[in-house]
Amino acid sequence: MRLKISLLKEPKHQELVSCVGWTTAEELYSCSDDHQIVKWNLLTSETTQIVKLPDDIYPIDFHWFPKSLGVKKQTQAESFVLTSSDGKFHLISKLGRVEKSVEAHCGAVLAGRWNYEGTALVTVGEDGQIKIWSKTGMLRSTLAQQGTPVYSVAWGPDSEKVLYTAGKQLIIKPLQPNAKVLQWKAHDGIILKVDWNSVNDLILSAGEDCKYKVWDSYGRPLYNSQPHEHPITSVAWAPDGELFAVGSFHTLRLCDKTGWSYALEKPNTGSIFNIAWSIDGTQIAGACGNGHVVFAHVVEQHWEWKNFQVTLTKRRAMQVRNVLNDAVDLLEFRDRVIKASLNYAHLVVSTSLQCYVFSTKNWNTPIIFDLKEGTVSLILQAERHFLLVDGSSIYLYSYEGRFISSPKFPGMRTDILNAQTVSLSNDTIAIRDKADEKIIFLFEASTGKPLGDGKFLSHKNEILEIALDQKGLTNDRKIAFIDKNRDLCITSVKRFGKEEQIIKLGTMVHTLAWNDTCNILCGLQDTRFIVWYYPNTVYVDRDILPKTLYERDASEFSKNPHIVSFVGNQVTIRRADGSLVHISITPYPAILHEYVSSSKWEDAVRLCRFVKEQTMWACLAAMAVANRDMTTAEIAYAAIGEIDKVQYINSIKNLPSKESKMAHILLFSGNIQEAEIVLLQAGLVYQAIQININLYNWERALELAVKYKTHVDTVLAYRQKFLETFGKQETNKRYLHYAEGLQIDWEKIKAKIEMEITKEREQSSSSQSSKSIGLKP
């Protein structure tokens, strides 16, 4: 990725340009010390003077009023705030009319910023004051006051906090009066510029110590640049939070959100005092010290999938290369490319007006359809369809270009959605809520309606990243997520009215990815790279989960690595320095998944015998129990030395009825309640009581015996035997009440139990014989 710079031969301003801002992706306003506000039209390359300010007004900063979302195409900003050296800020219309001028600070007003909703304005000045104003310019409060000038300010993503500079310190102050203030030393020189991104919640700072730094919202350092030759005078996040730009003297740098540099350009600009990204995130404008406005387009982005490499060579052209045969295809578009995604044998490209869908089998005939709003900020792909975040809505389309659905939920903010907070599978869409980050909304892909009974998924901690598995049946769909404590959890998306258990898979997990062809999960856990070959094991037999993992040292990936993709048996990881590392894992677990999904159990056993690895046998054991194939489970458990489980499986095989077998398989997986329900529905009340006795669940055993008026003496007898074994006296009031005047006769009880077992056997054989009679012609 690099920047394509365009700079006019002669500057349009006579003095330094202090600030720039985009109205649409093709229109920019610039303000200069020559008192002019100039409009730039990039389509026609024309510049027009909007207004000439009075000679005593020197503009310092300006910010467009946030656009209203949800109207067709880009709704243009209609007014902006301009801060100036005379201590005032001015509310100015798009046509250049000064609507209002407000005395704000003693000395220059160094920065002014609207919040994301456009309901409040923050200004900072040389007098060290931070003030909050209403939309109409009425003073609401003085948020803070200090003895040094405040050079830069930024709103937090929720518009509830303000970040500002204080010499070498950065301060985050909430708008609530008594809330805790966060302050830390950020640079060795005066901090000149800050920016806070609403999508990734990361902070940028630039200072006179010639460094730029990246921080999280708690003030923890994520990246610290090498010192440059000159002070860093400007920094700005791209709207989607994936990139940021850095400006200095004769220097413009494009960086990844983790800090490493994609490209460095040395235009003849003087110091770049202000950087603004276009709404679609494809181009940058810089306010230059020599009167120029520098424009830079982001080009040469790369996308890779299997043997295909796609490169954005120009604003309207892409090159596709097949690395197997070196075949090259050129793709040309009518409009500027905004976003693209390559996955599942399809390339999806969005321009400012249309969406193109290419198949990797045929690059010549794409499916083309018009976009609703033309401001795509995210593309996600699954095997059968893809998702677009376009303007204020989410749209799901098939690869044939057919519209499928558009999920919605109350308070949905599409401007802050990214690949970490939205996940897509063939049947489900998952979106983490921004208002309450502990909640995940789940939708049916085919209808866009809430999944199942409409309940959202709720966790006890804030969720950072979510990912749906990609294969298997809808009823088995799982979602994995990382929470604020860096715990990796997994749960089922189908709730069936009951609260599904959220199970912790690992701790200190930084990044995760599901495989695209089978439900294998990988993640970076502290200093280890881990692959969960069969994450469903946690629902089947948690004891053998450690045996189903692959682990290796991850220290070679340095600090803060990120998993980019997990395609086939290859995992791609991006290190903190920007380099890509590819890891290959064994292909056998994927083959095992394939055999099991096709119920080829003999082939699965044969594969495990061929590979001779404990992880494979452990995966097969869990898969067999999950699919109720106890013969295969017995072989697999024997292979990993779990003899007690082999014996239990043998005892299940000898049970008389299929209901009893089913109940004991559920018990084997720890599903006690479900096992009891199966037995009670089949009328096997004694067996339901007996499993509670075996588990020492005395309260429930007595409750069932009393409810069904049977085997009360059996429960009391086993309870008495249990207490005698441990030399204890009965203290439970219910047991004391039912034991009054009841003589325990073990002979009678054993006869009753024998009768129950005989009855169950007869019932089972009669149902089987009736079935066989029914089958005869």
Curated annotation (Swiss-Prot):
GO cellular component: a single term: ciliary basal body
Transmembrane segments: none
Protein's GO biological process: apoptotic process; articular cartilage development; bone mineralization involved in bone maturation; canonical NF-kappaB signal transduction; cartilage homeostasis; cilium assembly; endochondral ossification; establishment or maintenance of cell polarity
PROSITE patterns in UniProt: WD_REPEATS_2 (PS50082), WD_REPEATS_REGION (PS50294)
Disease: Short-rib thoracic dysplasia 2 with or without polydactyly: A form of short-rib thoracic dysplasia, a group of autosomal recessive ciliopathies that are characterized by a constricted thoracic cage, short ribs, shortened tubular bones, and a 'trident' appearance of the acetabular roof. Polydactyly is variably present. Non-skeletal involvement can include cleft lip/palate as well as anomalies of major organs such as the brain, eye, heart, kidneys, liver, pancreas, intestines, and genitalia.
Encoding gene per record: IFT80
Protein name per UniProt: Intraflagellar transport protein 80 homolog
Subcellular location: Cytoplasm; Cytoplasm, Cytoskeleton, Cilium basal body; Cytoplasm, Cytoskeleton, Cilium axoneme
Assembly and binders: Component of the IFT complex B, at least composed of IFT20, IFT22, IFT25, IFT27, IFT46, IFT52, TRAF3IP1/IFT54, IFT57, IFT74, IFT80, IFT81, and IFT88. Interacts with IFT88. Interacts with IFT57 and IFT70B.
Source organism of the structure: Homo sapiens (Human)
Ranges of compositional bias, category Low complexity: 764-777
